[in-house]
Swiss-Prot record:
It comes from the Eukaryota. One of its GO terms (cellular component) is mitochondrion. The chain crosses the membrane at residues 87-103, 133-153, 183-201. This is Mitochondrial import inner membrane translocase subunit tim23. It comes from Schizosaccharomyces pombe (strain 972 / ATCC 24843). Component of the TIM23 complex, at least composed of tim23, tim17, tim50 and tim21. The complex interacts with the tim44 component of the PAM complex. Keywords: Membrane, Mitochondrion, Mitochondrion inner membrane, Protein transport, Translocation, Transmembrane, Transmembrane helix, Transport.
Length: 210
């Protein structure tokens, strides 16, 4: 029965590891990292590659508009430029004109007020009330006018004073379309007249430059 209490121990094979195969990790230096890659630290020098020609980023702008007829006051690449320039210029001009109007109005209304603070407050109220009103109104008119004018020029394939006057008439009528026929007719006439004057002034200015 001794075999119940004894076990045959199987000897497991042991493998000997050569100490030369063990590699102890060492800290890598900056030179080791740079030497093992394609990175050239000499290129970071401020005076590196001065003997080589410079590389320029060439960005070709879109061609200017070639529609025949009256040219724009400034070089234009199409209806996008006309829309942006016209709307922005009109808004800033209206803001300045409205600001002067409000300044004059505020000074007249507060001329009898002795308190400097109250008078300044009244003047600022007049400027902030009239300035944005005129600026927003002229900006909207210029936005619609340039859009309609560009559409007419695209359909006719040429610029001309007829385009400007027609665009001005349609813009004025559309701007006062909720006020009745009389208000639409008055607004249409005023904006068409302003567009005609602007076209004549632009033509004379362009002729002087040429």
């Amino acid at each position: 029965m001794s075999w119940l209490f004894t076990r045959n121990k199987e000897e497991e094979p042991t493998s000997k590891i050569d100490s030369s195969e063990l590699q102890v990790p060492t800290e890598a230096t900056a030179s080791d990292i740079l030497s093992g890659s394609e990175f050239d630290p000499a290129k970071l020098h401020p005076l590196a590659d001065l003997d080589k020609p410079l590389d320029y980023l060439l960005i070709e702008e879109d061609a200017l508009s070639t529609l025949p007829g009256d040219s724009m006051a400034i070089p234009s690449r199409g209806w996008q430029d006309d829309l942006c320039y016209g709307t922005g210029t009109s808004y800033l001009s209206g803001l300045a004109i409205g600001g002067l109007w409000g300044l004059n109005e505020g000074m007249k209304k507060t001329k009898d007020i002795t308190s400097t603070r109250l008078r300044l407050n009244g003047i600022l109220n007049g400027v902030t009330r009239r300035g944005p009103f005129v600026g927003n109104s002229l900006g909207v008119l210029a936005l619609v006018y340039n859009g309609i004018n560009s559409l007419i020029g695209y359909k006719r394939q040429k610029h001309g004073w007829e385009n400007s006057v027609a665009a001005g008439a349609l813009t004025g009528a559309l701007y006062k379309s909720t006020r009745g026929l009389r208000a639409m007719a008055i607004s249409s006439s005023l904006v068409a007249t302003a567009a005609g004057i602007w076209t004549l002034a632009k033509r004379s200015f362009t002729k002087r430059l040429n």
